[in-house]
Amino acid sequence: MVGYIGNVDIGVFDAEVANSISAELERQNTLLQMIASENFVSRAVLQAQGSVLTNKYAEGYAGSRYYCGCALVDVVENLAVERLCRLFGCKFANVQPHSGSQANQQVFMALLKPGDTILGMSLDCGGHLTHGAAPNVSGRWFNAVSYGVNRDTGLIDMDEVEALALSAKPSLIIAGASSYPRRIDFAAFRAIADKVGAYLLADIAHYSGLIAGGCYPSPFGHAHVVTSTTHKTLRGPRGAVIMTDDEEIHKKIRLSVFPGMQGGPLMHVIAAKAVAFKEALHPDFKLYAQQVLENSRVLAGVLSSEGLDVVTGGTDSHIVLLDLRSKGVTGREVSSSLERAGIVCNKNAVPFDTEKPWVTSGIRLGSAAETSRGLGVPEFESIGRLVAKVVNACSLGQEKMSAAEAEVRREVNGLVRSLPMSAFPVCEVC
């Protein structure tokens, strides 16, 4: 018999990877994780994703697979679909997309032809790469037209959206964003889409957990089709879903996902999605969503009171976007300084940004992950003051910046020690 090392622990077989995992757990446990697209999943979600379902190949859909032995994974996928539809009150759902980008591409494949016109939010005003950005396939395969925000308010300019739609006659309009902190008027977008005979795609990747928790407007009843990732405010594994109330669109989506763009689904991830959807259906998730929103609003208020420029003047979501141009520093400089101080966020373009994407004039902060850790209003007030201290020091030279980083790091240590991420299972050999 050929020797098989399948029963050897990772710490014994591959210490390099094991040590990296252990170090990453320590990093997550000892720094403030303020990246808006990240969250902390539960022990149950981790257990599902790390299960033996990773061994099972299951091309096709529940009840119609190309492989035998799929009866049990069919149960899991059906649970995920049923729970997702119940969570958002929709009729049809596909839980197989591997990522949000792929989910959007699968919608394009289902509803569009190469060369069709799409209308989405510009990248610098808060849109996503898949909404028509030039380097992305959405900007290469389609005639991409972009709408933006009002220069004075930072809010989506619906008059511009309508004018562009009437002029460009898009086949698809995308309502959604990756760094837009305010509410999106899905009803207004649908009215514009109807005027030009376009499909409306709502990309709620960032907002889905808040929508599930009743803290952000729902696109259902307005959008023809809805996509979302499952790992941001929804607090599930990394992956995505596509939802609709239209059976004909659902049929097209099914074919677009498989066999159009994917082969075998990741059944261990779908199991983790099912677990996360059950968690989101629990009444406590509404309390979580409410706390996420309250924490982000407190954070925005403190940052504003400390003299920083909060884009749109506040937030209606988990996202707080800072414009650093008045401080004479870049997003790259400030995000690096904050990380040294123990606060992890990301550099981010702000409306009408003239800096390169790898530099930017802003930073994006999010409240979802640290709310999952258990931080509340008092802690987010402290975080706001700590962020402001670092930002203000960045414009005062290296010595003052280093001193501020050291001082803030000590305070961050106190915050995270009080609320360790005890839900995370740690492998003994790691």
From Swiss-Prot:
One of its GO terms (biological process) is tetrahydrofolate interconversion. GO terms for cellular component: cytosol. It is an enzyme of class 2 (transferase). Pathway: One-carbon metabolism; tetrahydrofolate interconversion; Amino-acid biosynthesis; glycine biosynthesis; glycine from L-serine: step 1/1. It is found in: Cytoplasm. It catalyses: (6R)-5,10-methylene-5,6,7,8-tetrahydrofolate + glycine + H2O = (6S)-5,6,7,8-tetrahydrofolate + L-serine. Transmembrane segments: none annotated. Its EC number is 2.1.2.1. (6S)-5,6,7,8-tetrahydrofolate binds at residues 123, 127-129, 248. Keywords: Amino-acid biosynthesis, Cytoplasm, One-carbon metabolism, Pyridoxal phosphate, Transferase. Its cofactor is pyridoxal 5'-phosphate. It comes from the Bacteria. SUPFAM superfamilies: PLP-dependent transferases. The modification N6-(pyridoxal phosphate)lysine is found at residue 232. Pfam families: SHMT (PF00464). The record marks 231 as: Plays an important role in substrate specificity. Homodimer. Catalyzes the reversible interconversion of serine and glycine with tetrahydrofolate (THF) serving as the one-carbon carrier. This reaction serves as the major source of one-carbon groups required for the biosynthesis of purines, thymidylate, methionine, and other important biomolecules. Also exhibits THF-independent aldolase activity toward beta-hydroxyamino acids, producing glycine and aldehydes, via a retro-aldol mechanism. Belongs to the SHMT family. This is Serine hydroxymethyltransferase. It comes from Anaplasma marginale (strain Florida). The gene is glyA.
